[in-house]
Every structure is written in structure tokens, then in C-alpha cells.
Amino acid sequence: MKRILVCPVCKSKEVELDAGGYTGKYYCKNCGYVGSFILEMTEGEYREMMEKEKFERKEDEKSKPKGVRED
């Protein structure tokens, strides 16, 4: 089963080795994250994680009072 690299900050799959892999760090093309900590998972695990986050965002929106803006 193929594993993918995922950015721990923005959850993007647009991650590659930084500096040709010499530093052991990764670079996210989406948010610019550079670091050695990276998420590694299967496509199925990635879909599960994204569905869970989508559900949690919907639940957060439901709990906010109507008409109140967050600046």
C-alpha cells in the first residue's frame, strides 16, 4: 500500500524533501512549512482525517451564536 506525505500544518499532500533530502527536512508547497516532522499515511487514512476535520468544522459552526462576527 502506497504511503503519502502530509503537511502537519495545513494537511496538504504537496510535500517534498527540502534541499534535495540532504537536511532530512520537508517543504510544503502549500503553506511553506519546513521541518523534519511530517505525517505519513495511506490515501484511506488521509480521506478519513479530512472527513473528520470537515465534520468538526461543521460542528464548530453550529455552536457559534448567529450574528456574531469573529475578527
From Swiss-Prot:
Stretches for region Disordered: 52-71
Domain of life: Archaea
Protein name from the UniProt record: Uncharacterized protein AF_0483
Highest classification ranks of the organism: Archaea, Methanobacteriati, Methanobacteriota, Archaeoglobi, Archaeoglobales
